[in-house]
């Protein structure tokens, strides 16, 4: 096991961070939520449509109800650090998926250091982090697609260990 942990190709890294705000309705609130994500990430957010009609919530199929933005690289790590600071570097083990990704939510975007603007309001958001290792692209590319072995795939235990050492955080077993 010690040989595997010292291999540079085995090191976990953040492939992408997805920030999502689901408003539940189209219109003015959705555009204000998009402004929040644009302030936070510096990128233009994309609007997401409802998959199907839910009459109890007043949602129609194909109605734009959410905005999200995908952030990669050092900017993703910096935004994730701010989000984890809000959560006080504590996540539950349920926040980690079997494939090694994790996510969490915050209640107020102003906790991230964004100045409060009364015309925008306060929005909560979800953070989704996709983890990966070097060389994992061979399973997703179009040309010369291949597979990777089970030992190289990310899993829940590896991600939890990486999370604890990287951010000096704790994972609660609730």
From Swiss-Prot:
Keywords from the UniProt entry: Cytoplasm, Ribonucleoprotein, Ribosomal protein
Gene: RPL11
Subunit-structure text: Component of the large ribosomal subunit. Mature ribosomes consist of a small (40S) and a large (60S) subunit. The 40S subunit contains about 32 different proteins and 1 molecule of RNA (18S). The 60S subunit contains 45 different proteins and 3 molecules of RNA (25S, 5.8S and 5S).
PROSITE patterns (UniProt xref): RIBOSOMAL_L5
Known role: Component of the ribosome, a large ribonucleoprotein complex responsible for the synthesis of proteins in the cell. The small ribosomal subunit (SSU) binds messenger RNAs (mRNAs) and translates the encoded message by selecting cognate aminoacyl-transfer RNA (tRNA) molecules. The large subunit (LSU) contains the ribosomal catalytic site termed the peptidyl transferase center (PTC), which catalyzes the formation of peptide bonds, thereby polymerizing the amino acids delivered by tRNAs into a polypeptide chain.
Localization of this protein: Cytoplasm
Pfam families (UniProt xref): Ribosomal_L5, Ribosomal_L5_C
Lineage top rank: taxon: Eukaryota
Name of the featured protein: Large ribosomal subunit protein uL5
């Amino acid at each position: 096991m010690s040989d595997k942990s010292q291999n540079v190709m085995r090191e976990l890294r953040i492939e992408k961070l997805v920030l999502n705000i689901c408003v539940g309705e189209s219109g003015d609130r959705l555009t204000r939520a998009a402004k929040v994500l644009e302030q936070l990430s510096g990128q233009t957010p994309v609007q997401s449509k409802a998959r199907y009609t839910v009459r109890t919530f007043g949602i129609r199929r194909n109605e734009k109800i959410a905005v999200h933005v995908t952030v990669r690289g050092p900017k993703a790590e910096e935004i994730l650090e701010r989000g984890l600071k809000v959560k006080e570097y504590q996540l539950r083990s349920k926040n980690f998926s079997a494939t090694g990704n994790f996510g969490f939510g915050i209640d107020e975007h102003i906790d991230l250091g964004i100045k409060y603007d009364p015309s925008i309001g306060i929005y909560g958001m979800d953070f989704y982090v996709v983890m990966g290792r070097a060389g994992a692209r061979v399973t997703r590319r179009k040309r010369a697609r291949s597979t990777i072995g089970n030992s190289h795939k990310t899993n829940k235990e590896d991600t939890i260990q990486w999370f604890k050492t990287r951010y000096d955080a704790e994972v609660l077993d609730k």
